[in-house]
């Protein structure tokens, strides 16, 4: 696989020598890296002014490479990049045909970071500092995106967001996570909260079997709401690096949410097993309806085999069974003579 290098880089193989500077490198280490790069590619300049100009371009290239590779490390890019002998050239100076097209998603992430900096008034003392901060920001962004995907799938009871502290490590975020105490609700506020709950129910299609069940669920919802509000208050004052929100699991207990996650995980595992079985036996179906029907039969066969093998483990059966290429067929469809004797 080749490492595609954006702007001032050409394609090089992953196995080639890749510069791996760390964001926290000191100025002396970066200078040493530049000198090593010059020797490697036989670089020399006619004046100190020219060298300073070329070093600035090299630093900009190095920064882009580091940012890209950080995204690649977080799974946001499908390839890595490296610094090569064109790293001190402008886009116009690089020979035509050697510049890859910019990736739209990469441009979008860069634009998002720049907008975030503007909104939050962020400036940095050096390109190295900005690269380090962007790396942390990207990691926070990836974590928030992953969390929110789980929230969309019902595996989390709240959503998260990016805020002012998203370029800081956990150690750098101001300490003192004090619980925010909310004032007792008066009649007007209580009516607003009741209205909010009713709107939430409509939004997520919630209905309950009895007034007792609704009262119970509302209590859980209120506790979730309080926790989210307290967290977001801390986020506003800089004690958290992300914000939270309500979703369709906000009326469930932690145990119920965890149980849902387990159920979702088990269903995903069984689905993966079915897909693997289809590939193994070359199974395809003419329609989604037919596949759904066959999967139901396969699931019933799988259940029967699993139960039988549990009995075999306990000494209640003298043999074990396995799922084979007939597992999506009914008893009538299996060729005669291939079914075990009763």
UniProtKB/Swiss-Prot annotation:
Signal peptide feature range: 1-19
Gene3D superfamilies per the UniProt record, alphabetical: 1.10.287.2250
Modified how: N-glycosylated, with sialylated biantennary complex-type glycans.
InterPro entries the UniProt entry points to: Papain-like_cys_pep_sf, Prot_inhib_I29
GO MF entries: cysteine-type endopeptidase inhibitor activity
Coiled coil region boundaries: none
CC per GO annotation: vacuole
Locations listed in the record: Cytoplasm; Vacuole
The organism's place on the tree of life at top rank: Eukaryota
Glycan attachment points: 153, 184
This protein's record includes keyword Signal: yes
Keywords, ordered alphabetically: Cytoplasm, Glycoprotein, Protease inhibitor, Signal, Thiol protease inhibitor, Vacuole
Functional note: Inhibits papain and ficin (cysteine proteinases) but not trypsin (a serine proteinase).
Protein name: Cystein proteinase inhibitor protein salarin
The organism of origin for this protein: Salvelinus alpinus
Gene designation: salarin
